Every structure is written in structure tokens, then in C-alpha cells.
Amino acid sequence: MKELKFPKLSKDKMIEKLEHPSGLTRIIIDTDTANEIDDQFAIAWAALSPEKLKIEAVTAEPFSFAHHQREIFEAEQYLENIENNNIEKNISETPTNFALEWVKRLHKRGTKAKEVKFVNTDEGMELSYQEILTVYDKLSIPSKGKVFRGSTSYLKSLDQPIKSDASELIIDLAKSG
């Protein structure tokens, strides 16, 4: 991917940009809401803070752990081999600590790796979009014109932007000031 080059700001301009905003702050929340629980709290807090924040939009972004699926399955097999004293079957590389800890957390909940749905990016974005709508519904706040679907995949090249309702809206809001 091509390197991004941002313009150099003067020290005064940098300090100005970093100052805490006064008054009502316009925000866009770009979130993978269905991925972890913290995003629901962020949306709820922002929505319930109209004296501080003006939510221009909440946009759903893609997420996926499908690229970790094989690693997680192998880590689970590795741990099962150790548990069953089948050490000789563990000839391949030791799984990463990341994968081992993930499997341990699953097992603590009584879940096997094969029971986990490893969604693709398009599914992750749609799950996030639906979760944002759920948060708005639970708060009894209308979502029409406020919640937008994002891209269905990750950016592969800076030269090939991915068009989505969210990206078009973000561009329009940036242009309108």
C-alpha cells in the first residue's frame, strides 16, 4: 500500500488543532459495534449527551476474525493434545500466545472453537449495522438518516477507495464543514 503523506503543521497550528473543543462538538461514530461491547456504550453515551455532542452519523465498519480461524483451531488441538498426554502429536510450531489465550477464554465459557462463527468482513459490517440500529431502538431514538452501512471489505489500496453509504456521507460532511 502506498505511504500516506500528511502536510506538516506549524507548532501553533498543531496546538490549535489539539485544543479541547468548546461548545457543541460535531461527531461521526465509525464503529464495528457487533465486535465488542464497548461500542454500544460509546453510542449510548454520545446519544444521551446532546448538550455536548451532535452526532452527525453512526457508520458501521467491517470486522472479521476469519483470518484467525485456522490458528485458533490449531491452538485448541494443541491444548487438547497436551491434556490427553499426546505430546508427540505436537510436533508443529507452538501456537501463539494470542491463539492459546483465546482458546482458554472460550473453554472457560464452555465453548469450543468450532462453535465460534468467524464472520467475513461483509457479515461483520452488516452485524455492526444491525447492532447500531438495536442500540438506537433500545434508546427510543430515531435512527433514520443517522445510521449508515460502511464498506464490506478492508481497504486494499489507497488508490482504490471503497464506496459505501458511510464513506460517501463522511466525504459530504467533510466538504460541508
Regions found by a protein language model. Name each.
Residues 1-177:
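N-terminal acidic, glycine/proline-rich low-complexity segments
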